[in-house]
């Protein structure tokens, strides 16, 4: 498929609605207007017109908007037809447009891809369109809009510009080694480098916040049967999401709930009780539980407080702790405090957090909610934030690593050439975020996840 083709797609969700929009972009958009509307509308004015079939009969009537390139979303000629939102009407109109030569259905995300290729958006802004559509909370939506308006890109471009100036200074020091002043050791380059590193650290902190807003944290509730895992899921979700009985092994599959705590998304996963099971279905559920545990950001180790007084996870169930992935954060949740009479609250035991609560009555659950929020390092008061994806975090981490390596070369051996190379690699990593240095394969993966009409 060529980017020279004219593309068309429905820009509104499928199904019935008050309004249905078809978007056309490309060189043939002008021809589509002449054939379907009988005229070319005045640029950027709403024109109420009939939409005509091949034989001149009306298929529908509605609003036509004409945006001649390059002053359009894609940078190409764009025509939008806003008609009635019935699927049959829209399908007839779409088929009519596709009878014209050189016009085809758009691929997912192709409108945004063309906007990127025509320098109307950088890659981070294009991704923010999808993030804005997928936002699951008000704060995520606001942060996605900030990214779309260029907040994230501006921070990255500032770093790239600072690296460019630093590279010029370093290259000059390399090219003129006979100067009386040793530019590499006079402290100026080190000071500038430290400034860039500090700025990058600040961006990484904000990006981690943005990633939390977009991705959320995956929390798995695990423990023995009848410890109260499903009751805790229901308490956190605020609804009866899981069946709760006194029968051990009631939960046999993975149950997922998506919740928010002060705008922070959490993926709460209830799992089958862990034990040696003879039942084949339960055994499969237990294996799935372990798969979820291995991919978790945090495990809530659910303990029935009526069965043990132990508080150290290694004392409660050493085999379970031994099987957990290394460095996986654990929060011990001693349940049934309404029966044991334990004091509700949170404490620390050998480096692990311990929460005492009653999932059945809900007492102490707010303490757990606050603990989960704090464990993520989420700052609800951070203003002007932006959303970030995992690839953004990786690119920022790679840039930080190159800068640290460059600093080591500067201070350890005054190796200007090696410093210059590390600065170049850091700049390249940062430029991957906005798409200045990005492979075609990555572009394909990013835009293929978009809606068809975007």
UniProtKB/Swiss-Prot annotation:
Gene3D superfamilies: P-loop containing nucleotide triphosphate hydrolases, Probable tRNA modification gtpase trme, domain 1, tRNA modification GTPase MnmE domain 2. Residues 216-377 form the TrmE-type G domain. One of its GO terms (cellular component) is cytosol. The gene is mnmE. This is tRNA modification GTPase MnmE. K(+) binds at residues 226, 245, 247, 250. Mg(2+) binds at residues 230, 251. One of its GO terms (biological process) is tRNA methylation. Homodimer. Heterotetramer of two MnmE and two MnmG subunits.
